[in-house]
């Protein structure tokens, strides 16, 4: 049997407490295989309903919510990237481990599942390690979930770390 050569692991995070548990799995797998981790945080766009409500409240002459959202995301990307770096360094214990283990830190604006799949392709990820919020199969069927979409559309293996409240 041929053992797969895993060099790059994509770790999408929402920066929650559960994300720290998922990161620890990513770290252990990467260390065992000599791989590096791409850390990804996705900023989702406002829903049409939220945009409509906000646009209805804003006085005329002010940017629409789409423009405001884009400007806000761009302004926050650098701050969020630094927060993600700090989060990873805190979990790893020191910055030298961060430099050796982390290939890239990205903050991308878009729909979570699609961005995860796109970035996995861009970075030639060999594995995606992500959390699931433990919704029931029924709610996943009705609502869908990021993890469910990624598992079914990914061209590489996906390891899911369940959330247990």
Positions of the model-derived regions?
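Structural beta-alpha unit
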Residues: 1-4, 46, 78, 82, ...
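Small/aliphatic-rich secondary-structure junction motif
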Residues: 2-66
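Active-site phosphate/pyrophosphate- and oxyanion-stabilizing loops and adjacent acidic/basic residues
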Residues: 27, 92, 148
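Short glycine/proline- and acidic residue-enriched helix-loop micro-motifs
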Residues: 63-78, 102
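Gly/Ser-rich helix-loop-strand patches that form or flank binding pockets
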Residues: 114, 118-165
């Amino acid at each position: 049997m041929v053992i797969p050569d895993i060099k790059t692991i994509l770790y999408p995070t929402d920066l929650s407490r559960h994300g720290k548990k998922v990161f620890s799995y990513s770290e252990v797998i990467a260390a065992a295989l000599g791989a590096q981790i791409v850390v990804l945080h996705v900023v989702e766009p406002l829903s049409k309903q939220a945009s409509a409500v906000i646009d209805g409240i804003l006085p005329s002459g002010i940017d629409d919510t789409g423009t405001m959202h884009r400007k806000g995301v761009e302004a926050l990307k650098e701050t969020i990237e630094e927060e993600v770096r700090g989060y990873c360094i805190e979990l790893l214990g020191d910055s030298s481990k961060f430099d050796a283990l982390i290939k890239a830190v990205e903050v991308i604006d878009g729909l979570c599942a699609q961005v995860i799949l796109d970035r996995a392709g861009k970075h030639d990820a060999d594995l995606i390690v992500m959390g699931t919020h433990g919704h029931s199969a029924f709610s996943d069927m009705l609502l869908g979930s990021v993890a469910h979409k990624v598992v079914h559309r990914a061209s590489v293996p996906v390891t899911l770390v369940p959330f247990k409240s």
